[in-house]
């Protein structure tokens, strides 16, 4: 029997897993995905740190993406799993605010970081001679700190505003985490002003970055087409297609949830789509970036050989 343990300020997360065998199967599946995401992203961070061949702006940005994904999925899955395991789906008002803040911080930072990674590839392929200047250490450190800071500021503003809205007696959030669009359905007041604010923020963090990424890769594909080296074209296509796959997995469901009017989508759709950008993407990113990347696989081989040579 589920024990909500609710107080007047608690929210109830209805969750993703039904109380049945299917729910148990999904619980086990998502815990395995969570563990894969932890192992994959931690391995990517350690690999880039340990292998000097990967000490480049491209891989430094990739290590930050892994760090964001690691925190991203850790903000959502442990609470969701414990809710199902112990049957206590309540979350305090403050706890909900903290989860919402970190979720939006990591989401915003990842959107901006993916744009920085696209710019990095654009400069590397279209202006290779200018790459050391345009992507200096100062530049990529600014990109990373800027992504984190802007994501945090945006998240702080939304969290403070969302948690000052009066909520009705029904505190049941039809979601598996404290997502603002799902919470707005419980508000006792008209939230159209805030919804427009969310739309504007989503445009800044989704539409503008995606447009920048699309333009960058448009120029990249044109430059690749003009390359004389077949090996160079193959490497460039591989790198770009990998990044575009990650971008599509992340941006498409996010854009539908936050830019599509509430009347044209259901809360069930929001929950299913949220699985893509909160759980599946953090698990898939290290796999996508490593399987098709000879430099990463080569670095992995070198690190393993060094470990065994030290032991011997």
Swiss-Prot record:
Pfam families to which the protein is assigned, alphabetical: 7tm_4 (PF13853)
Species of origin: Homo sapiens
GO molecular function terms listed in the Swiss-Prot or TrEMBL record: G protein-coupled receptor activity; olfactory receptor activity
Disulfide-bond pairs as recorded: 96-188
Protein topology in the membrane: Multi-pass membrane protein
Primary localisation category: membrane
Protein location: Cell membrane
SUPFAM superfamilies hit by this protein: Family A G protein-coupled receptor-like
Signal peptide range: none
Keyword list, A-Z: Cell membrane, Disulfide bond, G-protein coupled receptor, Glycoprotein, Membrane, Olfaction, Receptor, Sensory transduction, Transducer, Transmembrane, Transmembrane helix
Protein name: Olfactory receptor 2L5
Keyword Cell membrane in record: yes
Presence of keyword ATP-binding: no
Membrane-side (Extracellular) residue stretches: 1-24, 79-99, 158-194, 259-271
Family: Belongs to the G-protein coupled receptor 1 family.
Recorded GO CC terms: plasma membrane
Stretches that traverse the bilayer: 25-48, 57-78, 100-119, 139-157, 195-218, 236-258, 272-291
Functional summary from the UniProt entry: Odorant receptor.
Glycosylation sites: 5
Recorded name of the encoding gene: OR2L5
GO BP terms in the entry: detection of chemical stimulus involved in sensory perception of smell
InterPro entries reported in the protein's UniProt record: GPCR_Rhodpsn, GPCR_Rhodpsn_7TM, Olfact_rcpt
Topological domain ranges for the Cytoplasmic compartment: 49-56, 120-138, 219-235, 292-312
């Amino acid at each position: 029997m589920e024990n909500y343990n609710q107080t007047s300020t608690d929210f109830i997360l209805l969750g993703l897993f039904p109380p049945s065998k299917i729910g148990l199967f999904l619980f086990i599946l998502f815990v395995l995905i969570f563990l894969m995401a932890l192992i994959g992203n931690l391995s990517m961070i350690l690999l880039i740190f340990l292998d000097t061949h990967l000490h480049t702006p491209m891989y430094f940005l990739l290590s930050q993406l892994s760090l964001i994904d690691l925190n991203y999925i850790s903000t959502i899955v442990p609470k969701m799993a414990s809710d199902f395991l112990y049957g206590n789906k309540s979350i305090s008002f403050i706890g909900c605010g903290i989860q919402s803040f970190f979720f939006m911080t990591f989401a915003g930072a990842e959107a901006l970081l993916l744009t920085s990674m696209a710019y990095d590839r654009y400069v590397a392929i279209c202006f290779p001679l200018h790459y050391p200047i345009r992507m200096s250490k100062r530049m990529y450190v600014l990109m990373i700190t800027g992504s984190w800071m802007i994501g945090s500021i945006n998240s702080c503003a939304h969290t403070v505003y969302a948690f000052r809205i009066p909520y009705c007696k029904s505190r049941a959030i039809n979601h598996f985490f404290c997502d603002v669009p799902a919470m707005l359905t419980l508000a006792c007041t008209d939230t159209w002003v805030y919804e427009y604010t969310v739309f504007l923020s989503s445009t800044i963090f989704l539409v503008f970055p995606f447009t920048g990424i699309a333009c960058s890769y448009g120029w990249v594909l044109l430059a690749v087409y003009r390359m004389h080296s077949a090996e160079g074209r193959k490497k460039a296509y591989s790198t770009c297609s990998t990044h575009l796959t990650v971008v599509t997995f992340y941006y498409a469901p996010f854009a539908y949830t936050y830019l599509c009017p509430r009347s044209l989508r259901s809360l069930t759709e929001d929950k299913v789509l949220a699985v893509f950008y909160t759980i599946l993407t953090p698990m898939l990113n290290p796999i996508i970036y490593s399987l098709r990347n000879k430099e990463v696989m080569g670095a992995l081989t070198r690190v393993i050989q060094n470990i065994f040579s030290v032991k011997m």
